[in-house]
Amino acid sequence: MLPTIGGEHASRILFLIIEFFDVAEEGENKNVRGLSYIAENSNDTIAVGTTDSIAIPLNTNRNTTKYQFIRNTNNPNIRNADTIEFIYEVNEVYVNRACGFKAVYKDLSAIRSIETPASNNWIRSVSIEKLNVENEQNTHVNIDH
């Protein structure tokens, strides 16, 4: 494979790294069965499968991205969708002459939509682990379920 001009940052969007945890066992990763997600105003559902972490893109043209996270996607009897809106500032950071600039996200926050009754939500809490999304080596958001 040929190297890319600009190295690892060329033609690349930084992804938000999310880990899923067991709400009953603090600090214990917990798989989400049949996970998929869809961005607001999109018709493309991304099927992930069973996992305890995902990487999702944030919109660089706006300061907010809203996703619907769906568990048990393939079972209509127990399918459950929750919505989280991520809010941030988009800043451009100079990488080098070959690559130019890349987008980083600052002051990340999240708003979880609460259903009525709240027990209908499969996502119990969302916590921001890194306020700034500058790389993909660290988890940025924890979701307890």
Per-region residue spans from a language model:
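Long, hydrophobic N-terminal alpha-helical segment
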Residues: M1-A55
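Extracytoplasmic cysteine-anchoring/structural motifs
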Residues: M1-A10, P57-H145
